[in-house]
Each structure stands twice: as C-alpha cells, then as structure tokens.
Amino acid sequence: MNYTLTRAERKSQRHYPNETTQSTIDPIEGYLKKNILMGKVTKLLHKIVNWGRKNSLWPYNFGLSCCYVEMVTAFTSVHDVARFGSEVLRASPRQADVMVIAGTPFIKMAPVIQRLYDQMLEPKWVISMGACANSGGMYDIYSVVQGVDKFLPVDIYIPGCPPRPEAYIHALTLLQKTINEERRPLSWVVGEQGIYRKKMLSEKIQNRKKRISVVNLPTSEKI
C-alpha cells in the first residue's frame, strides 16, 4: 500500500476539505495485470504528462509576511529558479499551478486564501513556507491560524523562520519528485477520477541517521 487515493465527496456537508483518502496500490499495476500493452501505454502517458507538469510549475504571486521576501529572492539571478521551470509568477490564481503560503496566516485572511485556492485549476499544489504557515510559529494567539493545513491540503512543508531561498528551491525539487510519482485522471470520462499519490518519507526521517552520525560540528568559518 505505497499509494494514497483521494476522492472528492460531492455530497459531503463539510465546507472543506470535501474529500476522502485511503491507502491503495499503484493503479498502473492493475492495468498491467489486465492488459500488458495498454498498461505500458498508460504508464508512458503518465510519465510524459508528469514530466511536463513538474517542469512547468507556475507559482501564484501571493505572500503574507517576511517569508515572501525570501521566496522572491529565489527568483533573482543568484539562485535562478528558472532552472526548475518555476520562474513565471502569475497574478491570477486561474493561471497558477502552485500556491506558496509564505508568511503568517491570520484568521481573517483564511477565507480569502481558501477562496483563492478554490479558484486555481487542477492540477494544483500547495507549499507551506515558514514556521508561521506550518504551525503558527511564535504567534500562539487567537488571531493566527495554527497551520494552513487546518484548511488547505499541504503538499510540502518548509521549516525555518524565515527559510532561506535555498530551502524554497529544495521544496520545489521535492514537489517535482512528488508530481513525478502521481497518477491523475488523463480524461474526465475514462478511468478513476481520484488522485493517486505515492507515500513519500519526510526529510526528517530520511536524514535522521545522517544527523545522529554527526559528532564534530563544523565551526562558523567552515559553514
């Protein structure tokens, strides 16, 4: 069960999220068992479509606080985010693929953020950038949402207060890896209309042994 299937619930009474998630296997394996030729063709189509999607991620020009300054710094010539096909900032959510929540999400701003997200066309992804967007950060008060995942489905979390532009670029590469393993509907008529996502281990778990093995910490001059 290395994949999760997310289906939209049209009759759900909840405002958001109107979806259910369950563990499953890669649907390509089922296609291969039924018909090897059609299974390989379907796998190739998903590979081509995912390649195009992951190399053409247009972010929505949207910022809430100081993390937005670090985000736009990644678009300068020093970092050159154009290498990843993500340099085209869009002023309209209808033309964007990725929404980066960069900053502090206030309670009054939450309905606006959610409405902008709903205006984005599928496929769409969300990156939570910074401690405030991840968990409220230092603002454990009534006016700040304690994490945007309370009302939005977050794909990638970026720790830091604020995170550096390199962290944003790293998040883009992780999102590209996630998109490369996705299985989305290729037609609104044929096949399952849910979204299959591969379960990816968090960077914290993957790098745990590496961090534990560090005994001699480098000095500030070597960093």
Curated annotation (Swiss-Prot):
Keywords: 4Fe-4S, Cell membrane, Iron, Iron-sulfur, Membrane, Metal-binding, NAD, Quinone, Translocase, Transport, Ubiquinone
Cofactor note: Binds 1 [4Fe-4S] cluster.
Reaction(s) the record says it catalyses: a quinone + NADH + 5 H(+)(in) = a quinol + NAD(+) + 4 H(+)(out)
EC number: 7.1.1.-
Topological type in the membrane: Peripheral membrane protein
Protein name in the entry: NADH-quinone oxidoreductase subunit B
Physiological role: NDH-1 shuttles electrons from NADH, via FMN and iron-sulfur (Fe-S) centers, to quinones in the respiratory chain. Couples the redox reaction to proton translocation (for every two electrons transferred, four hydrogen ions are translocated across the cytoplasmic membrane), and thus conserves the redox energy in a proton gradient.
Cofactor entry: [4Fe-4S] cluster
Any single GO BP term: electron transport coupled proton transport
Record: residues binding [4Fe-4S] cluster: C66, C67, C132, C161
Database matches in InterPro entries: NADH_UbQ_OxRdtase-like_20kDa (IPR006137), NADH_UQ_OxRdtase_20Kd_su (IPR006138)
Organism: Buchnera aphidicola subsp. Schizaphis graminum (strain Sg)
TM regions (residue ranges): none
Gene Ontology CC terms, in alphabetical order: plasma membrane; respiratory chain complex I
Keyword Oxidoreductase on entry: no
